């Protein structure tokens, strides 16, 4: 083992985290109740310290008489401005050679996650991946990389001067758009290289995907180490930091797998680095990241040197302090919070599968997908991938509607599916809000889609302005009609679809083709439905002449400088819906 030298950014006194023996003394009840770094940052934030160094903004000093002060305080608050400081060394701690509260916080994190060492980063897991690869993969060495890895891995490998082989990806199935690394082929490639006398020195795995695919790391790490014990492994678990803290999710995590191999006496890789985007699944500020390490002193020394090379010399102390707080919350409350997330994700799947008002949505997995143990993968049960193709609108438009009209954000779309991440910040009220939004969107858009795809309309389809029906009940739809609706939508018109209220009998002429038979509408008069509790009520434009119901449309594509927030449906009559037109040709 090579000990750190005096020129190393993290020498023995300033090592980023403790050895396992020292961890044990800090990881019990006493350690679980402490947040040393957060406490230290809070202490300096509460003092009236005037800086002659940097950060004029600290404590809001540079904006006290500024016209932008109100906006600053509205965005950040006085506490955030006070906590964003540039102190280092003994005044707070050294980021690259920690000896005080940062060192202690990193020791507690290493104990909590089960690592030999943990580094805090305030520049995200892209930086953590670069640091880890710089430490593990020497120039000229051979690297076997999971093709599904984050871009930061690919860019880092390209800059390191290593010989890279990419293991291929595979698709979940024809019905599900998720992709992931082909782990059986990766392992076979690795074993073949060992047999040929040209083993890979480093393996990179993307073990928890954005789309909710988790790798069987106990099996993968054991097979890699059995074939070549001198291999180093980087495991990117960016989306699974919190999984450590729930018994259902913990078994597949990298650090738990290493603990299991140690307990059972199985072969271990030479070094294992694990990167966690704490802000993705824990209560940490954005760009807060953990880099965990299992290995000897040389691995820790090389990691500390790489951190010095790649991390900013102006770390964010609020971000670092949030990593300390997030660790404590995960240790003391994580299991309870994750249990709620798992239950809510199950509820969402059950509602989508059993509520006829949500029949336009179809949850993809976990049942029936990724169930082949030979794939060495499984579903992340906190992710719900939902097919929305039956709505007749694109996934991109669906995301925009959720955001603009309901204040709900979904980041991921894949084909006709969108991904809901039921993380620990989603509670029962948030899920109910989502379900109500989904029901309203189904009433609105599925009606419009059906009206546009059937041969004969049983609705009024009206563009406003000018309020003149494009089609009336009983009128035949043709490609020209669909094209006209698409053009009006693109120009910013609001498109309404409304059923005829009351009881009526009418015969409508058709411009071309045979006459349309008489249609009789025996539906009862329309009734008014309640507006969603979370949506403000706004007035609709003057209704078109034929229907008497008042509706407020949900508009796609129209200029909307005042839509903050907009209302999707306000006091809409039963049997009526207000919807943007569906692009021509889409079902």
Feature locations, PLM:
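Conserved N-terminal alpha-helix of the aminotransferase class I/II PLP-enzyme fold
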Residues: 80-127
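N-terminal "arm"/small-domain region of PLP-dependent enzymes with the aminotransferase-like
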Residues: 2-99, 231, 464-466, 472, ...
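Conserved active-site and cofactor/substrate-binding residues in soluble primary-metabolism enzymes
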Residues: 32, 36, 96, 100, ...
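Conserved C-terminal alpha-helix-loop-beta "cap" of PLP-dependent enzymes
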Residues: 312, 346-504
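Conserved PLP-enzyme active-site core in the AAT-like
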Residues: 125-353
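Long, low-complexity, intrinsically disordered segments
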Residues: 1-3, 8, 535-587
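Charged, glycine/proline-rich intrinsically disordered loops and linkers
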Residues: 66-83, 245-270, 366-371
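Long, compositionally biased low-complexity repeat segments characteristic
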Residues: 5-13, 17, 510-542, 548
């Amino acid at each position: 083992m090579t000990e750190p030298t005096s020129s190393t950014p993290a020498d023995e006194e300033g090592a980023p985290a403790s050895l396992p023996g020292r961890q044990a003394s800090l990881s019990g009840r006493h350690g679980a109740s402490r947040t040393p770094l957060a406490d230290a940052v809070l202490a300096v934030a509460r003092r009236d310290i005037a800086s002659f160094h940097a950060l004029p903004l600290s404590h809001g000093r540079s904006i006290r008489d500024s016209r932008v002060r109100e906006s600053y305080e509205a965005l950040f608050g006085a506490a955030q401005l006070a906590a964003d400081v540039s102190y280092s060394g003994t005044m707070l701690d050294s980021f690259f050679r920690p000896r005080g509260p940062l060192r202690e916080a990193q020791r507690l994190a290493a104990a909590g996650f089960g690592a030999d060492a943990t580094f805090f980063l305030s520049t995200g897991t892209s930086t953590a991946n670069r640091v880890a690869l710089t430490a593990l993969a020497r120039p000229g060495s051979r690297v076997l990389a999971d093709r599904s890895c984050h871009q930061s891995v690919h860019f880092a490998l390209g800059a390191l001067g290593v010989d890279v082989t990419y293991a291929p990806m595979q698709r979940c199935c024809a019905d599900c758009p998720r992709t992931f690394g082909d782990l059986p082929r990766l392992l076979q490639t690795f074993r073949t290289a060992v047999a040929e006398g040209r083993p890979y020195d480093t393996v990179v795995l993307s073990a928890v995907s954005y789309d909710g695919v988790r790798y069987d790391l106990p099996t993968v790490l054991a097979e890699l180490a059995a074939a070549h014990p001198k291999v180093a492994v980087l495991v990117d678990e960016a989306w699974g930091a919190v999984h450590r803290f729930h018994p259902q999710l913990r078994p597949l995590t990298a650090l738990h797998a290493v603990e299991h191999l140690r307990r059972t006496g199985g072969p271990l890789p030479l070094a294992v680095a694990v990167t966690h985007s704490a802000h993705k699944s824990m209560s940490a500020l954005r760009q807060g990241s953990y880099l965990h390490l299992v290995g000897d002193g040389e691995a820790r020394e090389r990691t500390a040197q790489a951190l010095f090379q790649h991390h900013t010399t102006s770390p964010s102390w609020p971000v670092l302090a949030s990593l300390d707080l997030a660790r404590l919350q995960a240790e003391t409350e994580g299991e309870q919070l994750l249990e709620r997330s798992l239950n809510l994700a199950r509820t969402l799947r059950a509602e989508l599968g059993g509520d006829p008002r949500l029949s336009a949505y179809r949850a993809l997995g976990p049942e029936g997908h990724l169930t082949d143990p030979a794939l060495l993968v499984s579903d992340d049960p906190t992710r719900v991938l939902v097919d929305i193709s039956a709505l007749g609108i694109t996934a991109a438009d669906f995301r925009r509607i959720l955001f603009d009209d309901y204040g709900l954000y979904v980041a991921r779309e894949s084909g006709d599916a969108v991904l809901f991440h039921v993380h620990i910040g989603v509670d029962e009220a948030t899920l109910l809000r989502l379900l109500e939004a989904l029901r309203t969107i189904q009433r609105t858009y599925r009606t419009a889609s059906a009206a546009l795809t059937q041969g004969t309309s049983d609705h009024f389809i009206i563009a406003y302005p000018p309020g003149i029906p494009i089609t009336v009940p009983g009128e035949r739809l043709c490609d020209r009609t669909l094209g006209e609706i698409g053009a009006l939508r693109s120009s910013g018109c609001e498109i309404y679809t409304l059923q005829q209220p009351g009881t009526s009998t009418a015969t409508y002429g058709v411009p071309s083709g045979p006459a349309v038979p008489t249609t009789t509408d025996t539906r009862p008069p329309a009734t008014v439905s309640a507006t969603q509790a979370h949506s403000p009520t706004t007035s609709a434009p003057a209704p078109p002449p034929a229907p008497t119901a008042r509706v407020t449309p949900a508009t796609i594509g129209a200029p909307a400088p005042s839509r903050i927030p907009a209302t999707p449906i306000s006091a809409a009559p039963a049997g009526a819906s207000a919807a943007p037109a569906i692009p021509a040709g889409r079902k």
